[in-house]
């Protein structure tokens, strides 16, 4: 069994399959797990209230919300159930709120509640002037987008799934014995079953198998991360009334204690265009000025860009081809993080129907990821951790309070940090106010020593020692 794509969906599928007596390979073109679309989103665990009723996405997002809400705390994935307010800014939007609540009810979500303008401003005193009312969605939550795919991949690996990175799938050949031969940028892989969870490139992989049911058009979303001093400005996830194109620009806290503004929504052709744009950031500032005016007086910590795998269809594109022993998971947009575990369940059922024999293992090992969220104690705050290993009391990244012990643990993990980017997602090092200006030298030295690499090699530079 080969799973192409080690994003949050592919990793969730690998974790699901790891419960059975199968030989599985999780393969990705990138240098790390969750390094594509999965790392750059709004980091919200969606309740599914606004999905289109009757769609596969609606069903899997609702199921995924329940699964991930239960799995997350046990696996160490930071989740904060702070709720959301869907804010109406004019009479037309206000009139749309009852219909949105009815839509939520058709999706099985019955907790949506209309609130008047007075209650809205009591809940959010820093909200910009002119709001007319809101819909309260209590089950929208914050989640760490980095830890979720890492937890899935880690649990898959400790239960026997092989992980192969830096392996772009360039071709598919049929072998006389009925196996698929995946030609990658590193080697060839033989697999009886193949699951395509390649995200932005799912359509390209699908065409290698002879199908053309959808085309992925990258939808660029730019976001601005504000300093932690801005966090008290907002108490809920502040959502706009959605459009047909996008859920719109929101203001939301993060599990790291920042505030984020975004995303934009721009369909583009280039699947690698993750640079921010002046026009995009200007648009966000204009919208942010109306949403929470005081936010624009706060310092910006970072800007990032994510590409969502939009297609011409209004639903997930999940298809099973039993004769080929092939499954395609495409068109998984901004709800993919929430739906990931339910998508994995759905794929398992489809593979079983396609003839895959599943025998459950006697043991399925659990994992607990190191906490990088602010709602629970961090290692530098834990006397027991420091007593057991003094490195957990030695802070290296002072903006984010990341310790030497966390960095070394990330390098030694079952799915280890292999780069500074990978270390950021596992520990928060270099993600703070100074963006590594003060700590990058020490963090890089620690990572290079722990990996047994020169700094030049780690950074992809010519090795000056040779």
Regions found by a protein language model. Give the residues of each.
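Dinucleotide-binding Rossmann-like beta1-alpha1 core, especially the glycine-rich loop
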Residues: 43-123, 248-249
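Iron-sulfur (Fe-S) cluster-binding segments and ferredoxin-like electron-carrier domains
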Residues: 272, 403-413, 437-455
């Amino acid at each position: 069994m080969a799973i192409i794509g080690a994003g949050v969906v592919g990793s969730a599928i690998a974790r699901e399959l790891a419960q059975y007596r199968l030989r599985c390979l999780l393969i990705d073109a990138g240098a790390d797990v969750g390094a594509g679309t999965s790392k750059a989103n709004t980091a919200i665990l969606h309740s599914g209230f606004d999905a289109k009723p009757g769609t596969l996405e609606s069903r899997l997002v609702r199921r995924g919300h329940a699964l991930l809400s239960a799995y997350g705390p046990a696996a160490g994935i930071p989740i904060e159930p702070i709720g959301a307010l869907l804010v109406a800014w004019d009479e037309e939007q206000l009139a749309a709120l009852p219909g949105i609540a009815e839509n939520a009810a058709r999706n099985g979500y019955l907790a949506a509640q209309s609130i008047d303008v007075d209650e809205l401003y009591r809940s959010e005193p820093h909200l910009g002037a002119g709001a007319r009312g809101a819909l309260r969605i209590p089950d929208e939550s914050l989640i760490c987008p980095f830890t979720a795919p890492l937890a899935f991949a880690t649990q898959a690996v400790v239960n026997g799934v092989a992980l192969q990175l830096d392996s772009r799938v360039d071709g598919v050949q049929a072998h006389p014995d009925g196996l698929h031969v995946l030609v990658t940028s590193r080697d060839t892989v033989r697999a009886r079953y193949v699951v395509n969870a390649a995200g932005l490139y799912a359509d390209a992989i699908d065409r290698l198998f002879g199908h053309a049911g959808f085309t992925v058009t990258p939808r660029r979303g730019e976001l601005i991360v504000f300093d932690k001093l801005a966090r008290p400005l907002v108490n809920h996830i502040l959502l706009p009334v959605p459009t047909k194109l996008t859920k719109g620009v929101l203001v939301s806290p993060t599990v790291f204690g920042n505030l984020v503004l975004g995303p934009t929504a721009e369909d583009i052709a280039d699947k690698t265009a993750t640079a921010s744009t002046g026009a995009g950031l200007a648009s966000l500032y204009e919208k942010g000025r109306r949403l929470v005016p005081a936010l624009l007086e706060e310092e910006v910590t970072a800007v990032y860009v994510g590409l969502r795998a939009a297609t011409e269809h209004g639903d997930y594109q999940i298809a099973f081809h039993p004769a080929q022993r092939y499954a395609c998971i495409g068109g998984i947009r901004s709800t993919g993080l929430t739906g990931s575990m339910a998508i994995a369940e759905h794929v398992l059922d489809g593979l079983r129907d396609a003839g895959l024999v599943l025998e459950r293992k006697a043991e399925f090992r659990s994992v607990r990821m190191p906490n990088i969220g602010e709602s629970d104690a961090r290692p530098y705050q834990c006397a027991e951790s420091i007593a057991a290993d003094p490195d957990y009391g030695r802070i290296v990244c002072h903006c984010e309070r990341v310790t030497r012990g966390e960095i070394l643990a990330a390098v030694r993990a079952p799915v280890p940090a292999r780069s500074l980017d990978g270390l950021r997602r596992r520990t928060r090092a270099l993600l703070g106010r100074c963006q590594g200006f003060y700590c990058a030298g020490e963090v890089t030295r620690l990572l290079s020593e722990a990996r047994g690499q020169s700094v030049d090699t780690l950074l992809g530079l010519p090795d000056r020692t040779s």
